[in-house]
């Protein structure tokens, strides 16, 4: 794959269109149903040429146009991006994708971390069951999930771990949890290291686990890609939408305000052009 676009808002689809017009293989990756605040907007009046259109309809028009040009789409949350020579590996739930360039278009939403989560990441806390599940074979683990996608992750971990407890970070259907996975009706508050294990403190008590897996619909920028420079919670870019790492670009609300559809579309276009130029130099 030439370009992997993370995010399916206006910036992402705009980037995909321009990339395909440049003849580059392109995939747009985002969790199913995610379209940011725009998907819930009842009426948009300030997008040129399309007055009084709903946000959902506008997004679908962007999507259909990009797909018609040959862009691919994948429903998954990208949990981590790692440089791999002149390529990038994107860990996307139960899959690993490779691309020559990455364009980040995830919007402005940022997850709120549990106290202690960042400190324990990679040391008992993980965002990827496929990547790290093997380290917890025969051990006790917990799954903390903000959506029903965590049910599938819990099922995978159950095939490895001795026991799996499931905590819903936000209300969602847990009726399809497999046998052997216990739903715990407690609210996680914080994480800490205790007795050589991960202590999960809830609104009721403290539970000790060998590992804790956390699944949300977004990943903190500083944990998504090591070395990515930010400014006030936004990705720092230059006028060509180049981020601080070679081969990485960003567009849309993720680069900061003003949070406008037209800005996102324009930045997506610029990012695709810059990414195409970067790939051409790779030879």
Say what each PLM segment does.
Residues 2-27:
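N-terminal Rossmann-like FAD-binding beta1-loop-alpha1 element of flavoenzymes
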Residues 66-85, 89-91, 97-99, 159-239, ...:
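A Rossmann-like FAD-binding core segment of flavoenzymes
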Residues 32-55:
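Conserved N-terminal glycine-rich FAD pyrophosphate-binding loop of Rossmann-like flavoproteins
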Residues 9-10, 33, 148-149, 255:
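Residue-level detector of alpha-helix initiation sites
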Residues 21-39, 167-173:
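Glycine-rich FAD pyrophosphate-binding loop
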Residues 113, 119-135, 215-263, 270-273, ...:
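FAD-site-proximal beta/loop scaffold in flavoenzymes
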Residues 73-138:
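Glycine/small-residue-rich loop that forms an oxyanion/phosphate-binding "nest" at active or ligand-binding sites
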């Amino acid at each position: 794959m030439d370009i992997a676009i993370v995010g399916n808002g206006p910036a992402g689809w705009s980037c995909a269109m321009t990339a395909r017009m440049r003849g580059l293989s392109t995939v747009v990756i985002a969790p199913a149903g995610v379209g940011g605040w725009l998907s819930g907007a009842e009426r948009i009046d300030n997008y040129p040429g399309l007055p009084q259109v709903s946000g959902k309809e506008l997004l679908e028009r962007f999507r259909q146009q990009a797909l018609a040009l040959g862009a691919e789409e994948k429903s998954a949350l990208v949990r981590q991006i790692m440089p791999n020579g002149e390529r990038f590996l994107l860990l996307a739930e139960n899959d690993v994708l490779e691309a020559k360039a990455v364009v980040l278009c995830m919007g402005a939403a940022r997850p709120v971390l549990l106290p202690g989560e960042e400190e324990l990441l990679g040391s008992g806390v993980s965002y990827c069951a496929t990547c790290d599940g093997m380290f917890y074979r025969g051990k006790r683990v917990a799954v903390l999930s903000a959506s029903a996608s965590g049910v599938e992750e819990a099922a995978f971990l159950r095939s490895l771990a001795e026991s799996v407890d499931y905590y819903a970070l936000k209300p969602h259907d847990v009726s399809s949890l497999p046998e052997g996975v216990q739903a715990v009706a407690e609210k996680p508050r914080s994480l800490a290291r205790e007795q050589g294990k991960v202590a999960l403190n809830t609104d009721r008590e403290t539970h000790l686990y060998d590992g804790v897996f956390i699944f949300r619909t977004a990943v903190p920028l500083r944990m998504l890609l090591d070395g990515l420079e930010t400014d006030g919670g936004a990705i720092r870019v230059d006028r060509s939408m180049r981020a601080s790492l070679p081969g990485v670009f960003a567009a849309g609300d993720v680069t900061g305000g003003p949070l406008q559809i037209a800005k996102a579309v324009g930045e997506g276009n610029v990012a695709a052009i810059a990414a195409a130029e970067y790939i051409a130099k790779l030879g």
